[in-house]
Amino acid sequence: MSNKPSLSYKDAGVDIDAGDALVQRIKSVAKATSRPEVVGGLGGFGALCRIPTGYTSPLLVSGTDGVGTKLKLALQLNRHDTIGIDLVAMCVNDLLVCGAEPLFFLDYYATGKLDVDVAATVVTGIGEGCKLSNCALIGGETAEMPGMYQDDDYDLAGFCVGVVEEAEVITGENVAEGDVLIALASSGAHSNGYSLVRKVIEVSGVDVTSSNEQLDGQSIQDALMAPTRIYVKAIKALQDTLGSSALHAMSHITGGGLTDNLPRVLPETLAASIDTNSWQFSELFTWLQNQGNIEQSEMYRTFNCGVGFVIVVPKDKAEAAIQTLNDAGEKAWKLGEMVKREADAVVYR
């Protein structure tokens, strides 16, 4: 027998027992999100899920995303309870764009040293996001990787699968001149532009960990960490009321803002004419713009600026759509209209 010390995985920085403890902590979180289509529970090599009944020719829709450097702010403020909601929102809102119903969700959590309490808090937030989306949390991966990350740092990725009837896929091809753009209010900066947010905080000299500054009736910490709004239930209400055929296009306003996200779903011959007087920047976006001396065009191309989601409908359906969305708990308004494109795909007026 060698005189060398016997090494274990824990000596290398990987605590299997901590990983097992986390799985036990989050089993109830996953169970609370279950849908009838889910087969089995956590812990298998693969998660099983049936396609919901009622579909004639179902298409599966997939998406993956993260929450960017909002994680750095979460670590700085030691606030991990809502970042999981952000993760789910970024994925499920993307799926909504083609008219899909979110079905199941998986997460990836990577860290330098696994803190079971922090990880459980994050996953609890993921579970909350899944409940808000009627989406089952059916699996995930926790990776403890010493040397890849600083001990307390962690990164997140989410993966979501949804389902949509093939004949009801929303592609944007039916968008026509005169169609109305309807905005759904965001809850804040959502999960995009946080590298610029953090730069603004740096140049402003504000200590966000202790500042008593108020924005939009809440602390600056709450304003910056407000979870991304999930639009699943509102869009479902709209589909049930108007029918998918009346929804000519939808866009999730993420990185790139209105400027870059609207063109992704619009015909090349048309432009979105945005009425900038139809809403006002919240105190959060005004604060960011003033503290960072950010140009208006840069604001529109970096942040959602208060518009988290956009729906394009025929003019004669706009009033009913806005009413339905407001009744579903959203703040909706007419953002603009579709016009012939002359140059830019998005025109601010």
UniProtKB/Swiss-Prot annotation:
Subcellular location: Cytoplasm
Gene Ontology CC terms: cytosol
TM annotation in the entry: none
Organism per entry: Psychrobacter cryohalolentis (strain ATCC BAA-1226 / DSM 17306 / VKM B-2378 / K5)
Family: Belongs to the AIR synthase family.
InterPro entries named among the record's database cross-references: PurM-like_C_dom (IPR010918), PurM-like_C_sf (IPR036676), PurM-like_N (IPR016188), PurM-like_N_sf (IPR036921), PurM_cligase (IPR004733)
Keyword ATP-binding found: yes
EC number: 6.3.3.1
Keywords (A to Z) from UniProt: ATP-binding, Cytoplasm, Ligase, Nucleotide-binding, Purine biosynthesis
Keyword flag Manganese: no
Catalytic activity: 2-formamido-N(1)-(5-O-phospho-beta-D-ribosyl)acetamidine + ATP = 5-amino-1-(5-phospho-beta-D-ribosyl)imidazole + ADP + phosphate + H(+)
Pathway: Purine metabolism; IMP biosynthesis via de novo pathway; 5-amino-1-(5-phospho-D-ribosyl)imidazole from N(2)-formyl-N(1)-(5-phospho-D-ribosyl)glycinamide: step 2/2
Protein name: Phosphoribosylformylglycinamidine cyclo-ligase
Pfam families with a match to the protein in the record: AIRS, AIRS_C
GO molecular function, one term: phosphoribosylformylglycinamidine cyclo-ligase activity
GO biological process: 'de novo' IMP biosynthetic process; adenine biosynthetic process
Class of the enzyme per the UniProt entry, highest EC level: ligase
Chief location: cytoplasm
Coiled coil: none
Gene label: purM
